[in-house]
């Protein structure tokens, strides 16, 4: 049986990833971590481990211990913040499918540009410099609806599908 570690397993991305694994024909032993003890109750994992945040000095030692103690075959770090930290560790290269850390970014626009430059299909993206630019951006991108997103954050934080530039303006303000 393959053993998988899903970090950030209590967030919506982690929960959905675990659900996808459970829906497959294959049986997996899944260890889930999350820094939020309450979110850790959401995913259908076999083992739950409350972890410190990715920025805590104890995060990496704990991940290494989990990998060793549970004979983990594959690590799926769910939030981008944890993926970035784990991608920098050479001992985990064979246990993840993460790209080089230079491709990962906390900035969604940088990620979009890196993906585009590496021939991955991505949506057209514009950076808003001023609220007064909203109508022209909507026109340039086909009139809407458009996703309005913050450049940083996970889990769809500060994102909304807006039908008009007026709706986007109200969302931003």
Regions of interest found by a model, annotated:
Residues 14-25, 67, 87-90:
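Surface-exposed amphipathic alpha-helices with a cationic face
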């Amino acid at each position: 049986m393959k053993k998988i570690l899903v970090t950030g397993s209590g967030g919506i991305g982690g929960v959905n990833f675990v659900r996808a694994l459970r829906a497959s024909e294959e049986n997996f032993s899944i260890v889930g971590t999350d820094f939020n003890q309450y979110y850790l109750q959401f995913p259908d994992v076999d083992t739950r481990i409350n972890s410190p945040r990715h920025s805590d000095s104890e995060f990496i030692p704990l991940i290494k211990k989990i990998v060793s103690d549970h004979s983990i075959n594959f690590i799926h770090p769910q939030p981008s913040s944890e993926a970035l930290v784990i991608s920098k560790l050479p001992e985990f290269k064979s246990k993840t499918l993460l790209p080089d850390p230079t491709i990962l970014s906390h900035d969604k626009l940088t990620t979009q540009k890196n993906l585009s430059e590496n021939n991955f299909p991505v949506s057209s993206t514009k950076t808003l410099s001023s609220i007064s630019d909203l109508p022209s951006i909507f026109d340039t991108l086909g009139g809407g609806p458009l996703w309005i997103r913050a450049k940083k954050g996970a889990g769809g934080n500060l994102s909304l599908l807006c039908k008009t530039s007026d709706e986007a303006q109200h969302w931003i303000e």
